[in-house]
């Protein structure tokens, strides 16, 4: 249904997204936002309060291992379909995750995503027709518009609001913490996307 030129202007694309969201509000379709993000021991926390005389120190871990997260987020019901990996995220990893996702949809589903090269590669594009036959439609955002991808808000909250300092003490702690945040989203952790 979204066969028009990929590079619509910002306001036209935003109107198209609002139209899709109105269909979702009527339960005609499901709408999800897709993106990837990464977490490492190189802390995103800009400052931390500690008692006087007891400074909290986090060792610098430049070039630390990274936990990559892929996620589909439905902001209507806060359903999050996600996966973590410590491997590099490439087109094939994204395709495999899309295949997992499409196998669990129950009605026509629109996925809103950015134009990252792994989403626009020949390998990725070769899968689109198969996904469309299974009820999955892709709606690409205009360039440089992360504010239209609501899952970016979740990544921001995970990095800057929900993190506990103890998560940065070891890679295992961080991995467990990221998994707990993802598993607890919608129950223990909530965001009002409106």
Positions of PLM-derived features:
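Short functional hotspots at interaction and active-site rims
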Residues: 1-194
């Amino acid at each position: 249904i979204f066969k028009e030129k990929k590079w619509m202007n910002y306001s036209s694309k935003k109107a198209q997204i609002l139209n899709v969201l109105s269909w979702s509000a009527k339960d005609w379709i499901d709408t999800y936002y897709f993106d990837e993000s990464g977490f490492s021991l190189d802390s995103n926390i800009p400052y931390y309060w500690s008692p006087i005389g007891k400074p909290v120190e986090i060792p610098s871990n430049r070039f630390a291992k990274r936990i990559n997260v892929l996620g589909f987020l439905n902001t209507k019901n806060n359903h999050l379909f996600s996966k973590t990996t410590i491997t590099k995220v490439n087109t094939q990893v994204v395709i495999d995750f899309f295949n997992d996702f499409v196998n669990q949809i129950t009605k026509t589903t629109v996925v809103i995503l950015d134009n990252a090269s792994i989403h626009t590669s020949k390998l990725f594009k070769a899968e689109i027709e198969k996904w469309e036959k299974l009820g999955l439609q892709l709606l690409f955002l205009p360039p440089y518009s992360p504010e239209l991808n609501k899952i970016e808000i979740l990544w921001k909250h995970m990095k800057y609001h929900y993190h506990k300092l103890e998560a940065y003490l070891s890679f295992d702690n961080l991995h467990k913490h990221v998994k707990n945040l993802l598993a607890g989203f919608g129950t223990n952790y909530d965001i009002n996307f409106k």
